[in-house]
Every structure is written in C-alpha cells, then in structure tokens.
Amino acid sequence: MACRIAIDGPAGSGKTTVARLVAQRLGISYLDTGAMYRIVGLHLSRKGANVKSSSLKDYLKDLRIEYTDGNFYVNGTPVGEEIRTPEAGMYASLYAAHPDVREFLTRIQKEICKERNIVAEGRDIGTVVIPDAEVKIFLVASPEVRAKRRYFELIAKGYKVQYEDVLREIIERDQNDSKRDIAPLSKAVDAVEIDTSDLSIEEVVDMIIKLVRERCWEKF
C-alpha cells in the first residue's frame, strides 16, 4: 500500500515549502496542486473566459497538463515562473470556484496520486482529492504572518509590491477559497492541524516526518 500525505491550508501557510521538503526528506514524489490551478487560471484569463459562464469546458479542451518527475508541462512545454506572480494567484482563486475547473483538475490529481508514495499539497487534498490519505495535515498561520512571508518572497524575486496590498490579497483569497460552493477550503475531520506562525520550516517538517513514520513506518 502507498503512503499518501495530504497537506492543506490557506495561502501563505507554508504548504509548498513544507511539502517539497517533506518529499525530499522521504525521497518520494511531490505534487503542488496550487500550481495546477495557477496554470489553469492563467490559461483561462488569456482565453478571456468569463468565470460566470455556465460552462468552461470549451476553454479547457485544448489544455493538456502533464506531470513528469515532479515537473509540470502544458501542452508539452515546461511551466516556468509565470505561474508564481500575484496575478496568477488571483486568477487561480477566481477560477478555482468553477465546477468545470474543479472537475478537470481533480480528475488529473486523483490519477497522479493513485497508488503512489506522494506528498500532495493544496486546499482540498485531504477532503476531495485523496480523502483516504494515510496522513493528513492542515497548516495554518495568521493572515499577517502569511502576508509577510509572501511579501518577502515576492521582493526576493524582484517584484515591486506593498505589504498592505499583499495582506489584502491574502484576506481576499481566504474569503474566496473558504466561501466557494464547490470544494471550499476546510480542514478534514481527521487532519492534524499545525500552526506555523511561530515555528521554523525545519520544525514543521520534523513534526510531519515524525507523524509519517508513525503511520507509514514500514515504508520509512
């Protein structure tokens, strides 16, 4: 049996960094589902798709997302840093509420996680994508802490942003993600919640590794 680790939480809670490090420590696959929503968000925005449209299937039929060796490819082309911009994040949150987008990506994610040792992170991994995951984690942190992390990350990448704008976007994304009708951001009943506000990345990773070894001891 595979050991599947689901890590969920709001924007800026540390999911991506933590999940990647956990996967590296365990020597298993890592799936960034947030990147997949950013890919789709940018694709739909460039196509001029109206998020209020009853169907977005026609806009998605020519989009092929492949996952190979931890990397994403869109119609055969490697995905770059263009999906890491604040704009891409807002489009991801905007279009993620549409049922066609959820169905399109959930199907791909379920297939990727099927019978594989993997760390998958996002907002509905433990509740929708792999609800029977062997280990479920829900990371949280205050909006201010998450905004500060995101602000410094963007500054380091050369983006000119204001902390107040980043904080506002974090709060807006929280509202969009938690209030959407389909697969809203929520903690799975059996998930272990970890508040990362006052913890280092290493401390969070160590806590998750310990839990994984307790539940999947025969593999790690």
Which sequence ranges carry the predicted segments?
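Small-molecule kinase domains that catalyze NTP-dependent phosphoryl transfer to phosphate-bearing small molecules
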Residues: 59, 69, 109-115, 123, ...
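N-terminal phosphate/diphosphate-binding loop that engages ATP/GTP or pyrophosphate donors
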Residues: 24-86
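Hydrophobic positions on the alpha1 helix immediately C-terminal to the Walker A/P-loop
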Residues: 18
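P-loop (Walker A) phosphate-binding loop of NTP-binding proteins
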Residues: 10
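Residue-level signal for inorganic ion chemistry
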Residues: 34, 76, 105, 119, ...
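Hydrophobic anchor at the beta1->P-loop junction of P-loop NTPases
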Residues: 7
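Conserved lysine of the Walker
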Residues: 15
